[in-house]
């Protein structure tokens, strides 16, 4: 029998392996490997063919075909003979120091990090060395002395003074209650597990949403509550972004600044600006604050990332701080669901702000901390309706808020404790149970709701917020000791005073110096804040220590900003006037003086209005309701108008003559030939004359169902009647 010939690749391979491109498609044969993918995978797996002697018969596709022993040609280039890339130790040290300062400055951005030797900077920062035994890894002989192998020892203190300071700081920050390494006796007492409602914002799902937002955003905005900015910060997220995502920009937005005095907002912005760029913001669709500055900042970030088609801005923070409200304010309409309770936003949401800027809303996230249940409730993390015993947290509310504010809000003069306060409030509001007993639970929920929604005036004072204390006089005993010593020993210098008195004097002087240094530092920080906080409408009525008078520097800054805005508006008006004006210059010569006088009067009125506002802010401890103020200021104006009318009726005075002369001049100007209208004005007049309703002209000329019996006769209607008469005559 003859052996059949080899037919080659014309036959179909019947195997069902995944490497066979001709295999039969099964039930799930939609996502099978195609022929190109199979060839690529075979290329990865294949081996060169060798004979029995080990010589390559068939090389791989990517292997060189040059025979062994041939001399390869090197490309002629001058770089082979030039110096290699080297750097001096001094210049490297200078680069590291300058880069450190730039990286720590929150208002500076390194544009092209790929072209800089960033590894030289990052290699020095080794936080994991804290837990490593340095003597085991690097002995003293290899680090110091003639046999040292390191140019720079790996130490966390440069000298003894810094080492002592580090030790003192660690001892001051040590808390025995938080030390888990201490051996304690087991007394059998166990802390009760927290309820699930106090763990809101800590679930795995919400943290997954947070990491989704962080990964997909170029700029991360952390929204803080202006009443307690440090309490609503998330240090864990900040350290995570600094270590794991250093290329992402983090900024702070201080929301709800309408619930805090303006001086406190300004100081908090100055304090937080040392870490990250900070903006004060008031989320409102009708009367927002900081919206223009925020959008301008986002545009600057968009210009930084010119290589990207668009940038995404993620909003993160504690629950109920106003993340969704900030997004609605930026869009000027409701695009996110908002509510004064925590947990309204469930999942992340993409919103388009502009063509190149997208906003991402994120649910509120809480990092597990050692806050008590009361702290968690007062931060607004928990919904008040779900708290089983709200009356337990009222004591903290009464401690944090001033008694005068609480008595003003609830019209209760005095109380002994939290329970007494709730009972009085229940009787006053009528929240009673059967038998006339006060409903403490309902009243407690009312108070907590008022606290979370800002109806009770409260805010955490910024650091160094205490006013300057006048230097106190020295005690009389210490002052009297000095002359006695001088009389007894006139030839010797007085070096000692009464023991305790001298120590107290030195302590007071050091305290005053430190206080002055802190105040000077705060003043330097405050000068960097550029926002005009005078435009914030503060809702709560503060008094006493919470009201700080407006400083002269603040007034000057606000006046400068006001004058800058006025100049910008005037420049815009000039540009518009130059573009729109088409009149000859000869006609405008007479009106120039009047226009200048009018502009100056308007400017004076605006400055007067601004100064009145500043005075009102300075003496804002005395507040008058809006209706009462309108009545008070309306009466003098009416009296002034009536007096002017009486004067005009009695006799023509000098002022009356001037008014008559002005009226005559105006009549003369009006009698002159009217100026030619521009095309824009003519089109506007035509549009105003046109009827806005559809079909109005039809009813004017036609009688439809006797709607218009007194119809106007037109040429068309007369022609139609004439035709009808002719037709009847023919018949």
Curated annotation (Swiss-Prot):
SUPFAM superfamilies tied to this protein: P-loop containing nucleoside triphosphate hydrolases
Basic residues: bias regions: 681-695, 721-731
Biased segments, Basic and acidic residues type: 630-652, 662-671
UniProt-annotated binding residues for GTP: 317-324, 361-365
Classification via Pfam families: MMR_HSR1 (PF01926), NGP1NT (PF08153)
GO molecular function, one term: GTP binding
Bias type Polar residues, positions: 10-22
Residues with the N-acetylmethionine modification: 1
GO cellular component, as recorded: membrane; nucleolus; nucleus
Consequence when changing residue 463 to A: No effect on nucleolar localization
Superkingdom of origin organism: Eukaryota
Modified residues (Phosphoserine): 504
Protein name: Nucleolar GTP-binding protein 2
Species for this entry: Homo sapiens (Human)
The organism's taxonomic lineage, starting at the top: Eukaryota, Metazoa, Chordata, Craniata, Vertebrata
């Amino acid at each position: 029998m003859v052996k059949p010939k080899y037919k080659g690749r014309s036959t179909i391979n019947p195997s069902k392996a995944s490497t066979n491109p001709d295999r039969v498609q099964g039930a799930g044969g939609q996502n099978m490997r195609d022929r190109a993918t199979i060839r690529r995978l075979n290329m990865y797996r294949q081996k060169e063919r060798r004979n029995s002697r080990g010589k390559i018969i068939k090389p791989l596709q990517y292997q060189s075909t040059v025979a062994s022993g041939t001399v390869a040609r090197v490309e002629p280039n001058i770089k082979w003979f030039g110096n290699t890339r080297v750097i001096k130790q001094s210049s490297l040290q200078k680069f590291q120091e300058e880069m450190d300062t730039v990286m720590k400055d929150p208002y500076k951005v390194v544009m092209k990090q790929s072209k800089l030797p960033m590894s030289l900077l990052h290699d020095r920062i080794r936080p994991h060395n804290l837990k490593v035994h340095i003597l085991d890894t690097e002995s003293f002989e290899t680090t110091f002395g003639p046999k040292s192998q390191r140019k720079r020892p790996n130490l966390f203190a440069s000298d003894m003074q810094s080492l002592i300071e580090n030790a003192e700081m660690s001892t001051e920050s040590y808390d025995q209650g938080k030390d888990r390494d201490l051996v304690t006796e087991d007394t059998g007492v166990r802390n009760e597990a927290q309820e699930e409602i106090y763990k809101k914002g800590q679930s795995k799902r919400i943290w997954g949403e947070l990491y989704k937002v962080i990964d997909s955003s170029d700029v991360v905005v952390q929204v803080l509550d202006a009443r307690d900015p440090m309490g609503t910060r998330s240090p864990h997220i900040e350290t995570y972004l600094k270590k794991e995502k250093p290329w992402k920009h983090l900024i702070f937005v201080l929301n709800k600044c309408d619930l805090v005095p303006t001086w406190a907002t300004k100081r908090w912005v100055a304090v937080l600006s040392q870490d990250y760029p900070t903006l004060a913001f008031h989320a409102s669709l009708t009367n927002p604050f900081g919206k223009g500055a925020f959008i301008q900042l986002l545009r600057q970030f968009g210009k930084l990332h010119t290589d990207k088609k668009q940038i995404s801005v993620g909003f993160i923070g504690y629950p109920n701080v106003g993340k969704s409200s900030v997004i609605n304010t930026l869009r000027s309409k409701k695009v996110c669901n908002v509510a004064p309770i925590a947990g309204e936003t469930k999942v992340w949401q993409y919103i388009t702000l502009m063509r190149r800027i997208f906003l991402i809303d994120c649910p509120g996230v809480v990092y597990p901390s050692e806050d008590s249940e009361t702290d968690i409730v007062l931060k607004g993390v928990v919904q008040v309706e779900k708290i089983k015993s709200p009356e337990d947290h009222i004591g903290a509310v009464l401690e944090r808020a001033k008694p005068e504010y609480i008595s003003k809000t609830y019209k209760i003069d005095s109380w002994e404790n939290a329970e007494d306060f709730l009972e009085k409030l229940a009787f006053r509001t009528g929240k009673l149970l059967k038998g006339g007993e006060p409903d403490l639970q309902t009243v407690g929920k009312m108070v907590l709701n008022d606290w979370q929604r800002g109806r009770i005036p409260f805010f955490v004072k910024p650091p160094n917020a205490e006013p300057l204390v006048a230097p106190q006089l020295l005690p009389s005993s210490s002052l009297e000791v000095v002359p006695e010593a001088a009389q007894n020993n006139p030839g010797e210098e007085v070096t000692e005073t009464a023991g305790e008195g001298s120590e107290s004097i030195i302590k007071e002087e050091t305290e005053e110096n430190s206080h002055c240094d802190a105040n000077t530092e705060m003043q330097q920080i405050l000068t960097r804040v550029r926002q005009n906080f005078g435009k914030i409408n503060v809702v709560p009525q503060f008094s006493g220590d919470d009201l700080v008078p407006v400083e002269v520097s603040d007034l000057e800054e606000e006046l400068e900003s006001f004058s800058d805005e006025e100049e910008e508006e005037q420049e815009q008006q000039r540009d518009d006037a130059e573009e729109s004006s088409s009149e000859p210059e000869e006609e405008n010569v007479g009106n120039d003086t009047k226009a200048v006088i009018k502009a100056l009067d308007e400017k004076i009125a605006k400055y007067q209005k601004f100064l009145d506002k500043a005075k009102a802010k300075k003496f804002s401890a005395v507040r008058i309701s809006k209706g009462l103020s309108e009545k008070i200021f309306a009466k003098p104006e009416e009296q002034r108008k009536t007096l002017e009318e009486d004067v005009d009726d009695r006799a023509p005075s000098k002022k009356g003559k001037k008014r008559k002369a002005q009226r005559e001049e105006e009549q003369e100007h009006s009698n002159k030939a009217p100026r030619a209208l521009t095309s824009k004005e003519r089109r506007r007049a035509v549009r105003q004359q046109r009827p806005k309703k559809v079909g109005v002209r039809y009813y004017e000329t036609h009688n439809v169902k006797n709607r218009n019996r007194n119809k106007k006769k037109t040429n068309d209607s007369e022609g139609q009647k004439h035709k009808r008469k002719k037709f009847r005559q023919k018949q």
